[in-house]
Amino acid sequence: MLFRSDTLGAMSVCDPQNSMHGIYGSYLSEHIFTKAPKLGFNSDCSVEIKILEENFEKNHEQIAGFIVEPIVQGAGGMRIYNPQFLQKARELCTKYDILLIADEIATGFGHTGLMFAVEHANIKPDIMTVGKGLTGGYMTMAAMITSREVSSVISNSEIGVLMHGPTFMGNPLACSVANASIDLLLESNWQSNVKNIENIFTQELQNAKDLKLVKDVRNIGAIGIIELVDDCYAQKVQDYCVKNGVWIRPFGKLIYSIVAYTIAENDLRKIVKTMIDAIKSIEK
């Protein structure tokens, strides 16, 4: 399956305030959204869980599936949150016979320290989407993985197949690259590498916490994030970083890096230091 995140259907289930909803307006179909869990892997998300429960109780007859980016919301603000939220979502989906759909496009294949982010909550989704890490970034490819129950419904339907066919679906070269990438990952010491990356991110990002232009720093696995107080500084930070040999792509007021598991320690420290130096240069 080809990774096509910017279709109308995909955009319609993204953040209604900070995504492309505003640009496309009434072209996108309406969906029910719930309050995002509080920032922090160990933060108390009881309020958001309560709201989630109320949403399910009120709207479950209208809900076919609950779509969530597990543990880390990507385009929704690079938000890291408590696995308890996912556990409650799984419980509610089971209770009301609703499909739990985990979007692991950005988090899958080790980015959060476990092979898949849902493992932090010890749950199994009914449908999981994967991409990016599927081929190690070398080829464009994504996939939808389903439970046996879901696949049986599709297989036993009148048509007998999932009627979805992007131009490059099942691309032989991309499939070969995906197989090779997964083999290399499983043969490597990736979990130890990602843990070391996480520790370095934790250490180095502390140097940004007290800067006046920084609202928050957070990290998990191979993902490190600096949230600025305003997005007006992002372009200057990017310009500084590129000029000093570090390529970054800010997202709104977020300066972040998702690094390769094979990155050298000195390169990782340089990335974080350069991002921090960029912010300091603006504060002068």
Segments (PLM) and residue ranges:
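Conserved N-terminal phosphate-binding loop of PLP-dependent enzymes in the Aspartate aminotransferase
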Residues: 1-284
